[in-house]
Design a protein with these regions (language model features):
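Short alpha-helical "recognition helix" segments of helix-turn-helix
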Residues: 28-32
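A short, Lys/Arg-rich alpha-helix, primarily the initiator
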Residues: 1-21, 59
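Short, charged recognition helix plus adjacent turn
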Residues: 68-96
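Short, basic-rich loop-to-helix N-cap that marks the start of a DNA-contacting helix
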Residues: 47-62
Length: 96
């Protein structure tokens, strides 16, 4: 197991670069990061960002980008075993 002991969130420019690299819209990035909508995503990427991305949000987004569908489903199954009720839908990114 690991505990994050230090975290500096990515800059707005880094997140904007990732969005361009993936060819995603703000709505797609919001879904990828597990945040409400494009308005929430834009709070992380605006010229004067209103929010810094939390470690948990960044972790969720990185997991979506790094894990295979089976690995991600395994994590969701573990969450369900812990008592969570989770429903998902496929997220299609331009690079897929």
């Amino acid at each position: 197991m690991r505990k994050i002991t230090s975290f500096t969130p990515p800059s707005a420019a880094s997140l904007e670069q990732l969005m361009k690299q993936l060819g995603c819209t703000s709505n797609q990035m919001a879904a990828l990061a597990g945040v409400k909508d494009k308005n929430q995503w834009r709070k992380y990427t605006g010229a004067n960002p209103m929010r810094s991305m939390s470690a948990t949000t960044l972790f969720f987004m990185a997991a979506q980008l790094s894990l295979s569908p089976d690995e991600f489903e395994r994590v969701l199954d573990h969450m369900r075993n812990l008592g969570a009720d989770i429903a998902t839908e496929a997220l299609s990114l331009p690079s897929e």
